[in-house]
Amino acid sequence: MLMLRSPYSDSNALDHFLDELTGSVQFPYWRNADHNSFNFSDNIGEIVNDESKFSVQLDVSHFKPENLKIKLDGRELKIEGIQETKSEHGYLKRSFSKMILLPEDADLPSVKSAISNEGKLQIEAPKKTNSSRSIPINFVAKH
C-alpha cells in the first residue's frame, strides 16, 4: 500500500509551534487576560429587596464623588461615573453606566444615597407603607 504524505503537514505543525512560542514573547502579558477583571465598575455588591426597603451597593472606589451622577426617571435609577486623567505619559479615561429598575412599591421621593470612605456607594429606596388598615368596630349602647 502506498501512503502519500502532504508536503505541507510538517510545515504546518512547525508554523503552529513557532506561532505559539513567539506569540507569548511578542504580545504583552495582558493580551490573553480576562478583560472583565479590568472593568472596575462592574461590581454590584449587596442587593436587598425586602418588605421595608430596596437597596443596592456599588464599588465606585476608582471614582471621586464629584465624578459620579445618580438620576431617577420614574422607576429607572441611572448611576454614571466618568473619570479622566491626563499626564505627560498619556491619557486615561474610565467610565461606567448602570441602570436599575426600582420595585413598584418603592417610595421614589425618598430615595437617598451615601458613599463611604472606602468608595462603597449605597443607594436606598424605602418601600411605601401599606395604606390599608383595620378599622375597629365600636359598640354604642342605646339609653
Curated annotation (Swiss-Prot):
UniProt record, GO biological process: defense response to Gram-negative bacterium; endoplasmic reticulum unfolded protein response; IRE1-mediated unfolded protein response; protein refolding; response to heat
Pfam families on file: HSP20
Record carries keyword Coiled coil: no
SUPFAM superfamilies: HSP20-like chaperones
Protein name according to UniProt: Heat shock protein Hsp-16.41
Family: Belongs to the small heat shock protein (HSP20) family.
Domain sHSP: 35-140
Gene: hsp-16.41
GO molecular function, one term: unfolded protein binding
GO CC terms of this entry: cytoplasm; nucleus
Keyword Metal-binding assigned: no
InterPro entries in the cross-refs: A-crystallin/Hsp20_dom, Alpha-crystallin/sHSP_animal, HSP20-like_chaperone
Keyword terms of this UniProt record: Stress response
CDD domains: metazoan_ACD
Entry superkingdom: Eukaryota
